[in-house]
Amino acid sequence: IGRLVTRAAFNTGKVDIVAINDPFIDLHYMVYMFQYDSTHGKFHGTVKAENGKLVINGKAITIFQERDPANIKWGDAGAEYVVESTGVFTTMEKAGAHLKGGAKKVIISAPSADAPMFVMGVNHEKYNNTLKIVSNASCTTNCLAPLAKVIHDHFGIVEGLMTTVHAITATQKTVDGPSGKLWRDGRGAAQNIIPASTGAAKAVGKVIPELNGKLTGMAFRVPTPNVSVVDLTCRLEKPAKYDEIKKVVKQASEGPLKGILGYTEDQVVSCDFNSDTHSSTFDAGAGIALNDHFVKLISWYDNEFGYSNRVVDLMVHMASKE
């Protein structure tokens, strides 16, 4: 995610990357890893090592190699906003270590047990600049929440269940091995459909308080490298024809949620969303209604790149509140 947030920053030009911390690889390896990506292709631009710095598109970036976040001299490098993307320091206390080195704000690129969570297009307006440490929630919450918000605002969600058919990620195993958490998480990622837990649906209740306790869900990890899809099956308060649902989602995708929630009526498949920058793209042709109160809604997301673009957007939004 760190590499893709960096790509998103350079692609959009919205934020300036001034420093990167990675204790595990040297500078020349960073050049290689940033330049080549098996999923998203080669970086369209220049990247090289020069005078101990990583130089991307002519911009020199300071490199730190600290294992302890408290030792990173962010302030010296001029870094004000830190993206904590290790997946390890996800609590207020642990992520707060970055502030000791001179950072002003920390954005955790994962769900957090105690940091306030923000989803662009859903509850980002609730951010205020007294908050120093925030979470951008998970990629799945970023897919589900914008859709749930539109549906709830127009028709009311009584209750719902979410399933995400999710691409493999770095936490999984290439072949069977021991897992730190659930046993089946350790089974070979390329060979299996693996039922897994996800806090994404419950987290929607944190970013849309009216939906608290009304949604829960689970995941199936499937052997694809990237792009996932959310299935939201929910009971509606107000009766709605499926065509009405399509209409309001399309309107939202062209209006307040433009760039965050997409809409398509094409016969798409997962690969069509590789490197897509939306948080969520509603698949109008894939959803079904049992009746006017009970519907299954389908939305695609590039779980890597869409999310990384929202991290950048959240940073920009936070900076606008300074």
From Swiss-Prot:
Sites of N6,N6-dimethyllysine modification: K53, K181, K202, K214, K247, K250, K321
PROSITE patterns, per the entry: GAPDH
ADP-ribosylcysteine modification, residue list: C139
List of residues binding NAD(+): D22, R67, S109, N303
Residues the record lists as Phosphotyrosine modifications: Y29
Modified residues (S-nitrosocysteine): C139, C234
Transmembrane stretches, start-end: none
GO BP terms in the entry: glucose metabolic process; glycolytic process; innate immune response; microtubule cytoskeleton organization; neuron apoptotic process; peptidyl-cysteine S-trans-nitrosylation; positive regulation of canonical NF-kappaB signal transduction; positive regulation of type I interferon production
Cysteine persulfide modification, residue list: C139
Known EC number: 1.2.1.12, 2.6.99.-
Main location: cytoplasm
UniProt keyword terms in alphabetical order: Acetylation, ADP-ribosylation, Apoptosis, Cytoplasm, Cytoskeleton, Glycolysis, Immunity, Innate immunity, Isopeptide bond, Methylation, NAD, Nucleus, Oxidoreductase, Phosphoprotein, S-nitrosylation, Transferase, Translation regulation, Ubl conjugation
Modified residues (Phosphothreonine): T62, T140, T164, T169, T171, T198, T216, T224
S-(2-succinyl)cysteine modifications at: C139, C234
Residues carrying the site annotation Activates thiol group during catalysis: H166
Motif [IL]-x-C-x-x-[DE] motif boundaries: 232-237
Modified residues (Deamidated asparagine): N51, N57, N136, N142, N212, N303
Binding site for D-glyceraldehyde 3-phosphate: S138, C139, T140, T169, T198, G199, R221
Pathway the protein acts in: Carbohydrate degradation; glycolysis; pyruvate from D-glyceraldehyde 3-phosphate: step 1/5
Residues annotated with N6-acetyllysine modification: K48, K181, K206, K214, K241
Annotated active site: C139
Entry-annotated residues carrying N6-malonyllysine: K181, K202
Subunit structure of this chain's protein: Homotetramer. Interacts with TPPP; the interaction is direct. Interacts (when S-nitrosylated) with SIAH1; leading to nuclear translocation. Interacts with RILPL1/GOSPEL, leading to prevent the interaction between GAPDH and SIAH1 and prevent nuclear translocation. Interacts with CHP1; the interaction increases the binding of CHP1 with microtubules. Associates with microtubules. Interacts with EIF1AD, USP25, PRKCI and WARS1. Interacts with phosphorylated RPL13A; inhibited by oxidatively-modified low-densitity lipoprotein (LDL(ox)). Component of the GAIT complex.
Function summary: Has both glyceraldehyde-3-phosphate dehydrogenase and nitrosylase activities, thereby playing a role in glycolysis and nuclear functions, respectively. Glyceraldehyde-3-phosphate dehydrogenase is a key enzyme in glycolysis that catalyzes the first step of the pathway by converting D-glyceraldehyde 3-phosphate (G3P) into 3-phospho-D-glyceroyl phosphate. Modulates the organization and assembly of the cytoskeleton. Facilitates the CHP1-dependent microtubule and membrane associations through its ability to stimulate the binding of CHP1 to microtubules.
The record's note on its domains: The [IL]-x-C-x-x-[DE] motif is a proposed target motif for cysteine S-nitrosylation mediated by the iNOS-S100A8/A9 transnitrosylase complex.
Name recorded for this polypeptide: Glyceraldehyde-3-phosphate dehydrogenase
Gene giving rise to this polypeptide: GAPDH
